[in-house]
Regions:
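NAD(P)-dependent Rossmann-like dehydrogenase/reductase catalytic/cofactor-binding core
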Residues: 4-161
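Flavin (primarily FAD) cofactor-binding/catalytic cores of flavoenzymes
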Residues: 1
Length: 161
């Protein structure tokens, strides 16, 4: 109940600007009945964001997803399966088709890819987390393993620079 009250309060809060009047805050708190809803992002991150990272350069999210739609769906569905095996329900996850449609308008590489290209020595490693969680379930997917290896290669190079 307390989190739902916070959600409602944040949604209703406005900042009073002398120039623009009441402005909506750029902060949201979403409360879900399932603890697995936040894990729904894992499939999106793995199918698109981390697959922006290539051996020599970065590619836009739309190319990472739509360059090989079958591979993207395989990664997406595999990650959803990992989450379901943790206890999630299929209704917690966005259908791949809806994600792929949204990804078609993402013309830039992901923030993780841009950070690596910019020389970052550390980034958030959802790719590695998903891989390790899946390995505990006895699961591996070659495309995911390759993605983790490429991200690791960039980090190693950046740390050596």
């Amino acid at each position: 109940a307390m989190l739902r009250d916070l959600d409602t309060g944040i949604e209703a809060a406005r900042f009073q600007s002398p120039e623009h009047g009441a402005l909506e805050l750029p902060v949201k708190l979403r409360v879900f009945d399932s603890v697995f809803v936040p894990l729904a992002k894992w499939a999106m991150l793995m199918a698109g964001n981390y697959r922006c990272v290539q051996a020599e350069e970065m590619r836009p999210i739309k190319d990472a997803v739509h360059g090989d739609l079958d591979a993207s769906q395989a990664v997406y569905d595999w990650v959803v399966g990992v989450c379901i095996d943790l206890g999630g329900d299929i209704s917690d996850f966005v259908p791949f088709e809806k994600y792929a449609k949204a990804a078609s308008s993402l013309a830039n590489p992901s923030s993780a890819a841009r950070a690596l290209a910019g020389g970052a020595k550390n980034i958030e490693r959802v790719d590695k987390l998903v891989s390790l969680v899946a390995a505990q379930q006895g699961k591996h997917l070659e495309v995911v393993d390759e993605t983790v290896a490429v991200v690791e290669k960039w980090l190693t190079q950046n740390r050596a620079a």
